[in-house]
Amino acid sequence: MGKTTTTLNLGIGLAHQGRKVLLVDADPQGDLTTALGWTDADDLPVTLATQMKKILQDEPFVYNEGILHHEEGVDIIPTNIELSGMEISLVNAMSREQTLKLYLADLKKDYDYILIDCMPSLGMLTINALTAADSVIVPVEAHYLPG
C-alpha cells in the first residue's frame, strides 16, 4: 500500500536536502531494510528487536549501536523476523507502548527526522510507533467514487 516506499523516498528526499534522517524499520517483514540493500538482515548482530529486548529486560544498551548508514545519506535501524516475537514480549510488559519511544529518546538529538515504517496492522509494534511519533503520515490508495 506504499508505506515502505513513502518512508524510503521521503527519508532519502530529506537527506538530499541536507537533513539528518534516521529510518526505523518497525515491520518484521523488513522490507525497508531490504530496500536499502541489507538482504541478509538475519545475520546482523544488532537490530530493532535486539535493542527493544534490552529495554524490556532493563539491560544497558548503547543507543546508537547497530545503526547502519546508507550511501543515499540516511541511517537505518534495521529489522529482521526476530521483531515478530517482540509483539508477544510486549503484551505482558509494563509501559509496553513506551518501549520504542524510550529507545528513540536519545537518538532524537542526533537527527532532524526519524521516520518509522510500520506493519499494516495495529499491533503492539504499531502502537509503539504511534506513541513514539510526533506526527503520522497515513498513505491511502485513491479510488474513483462513482456518481
Regions from the PLM with identified roles:
Residues 1-147:
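P-loop NTP-binding core
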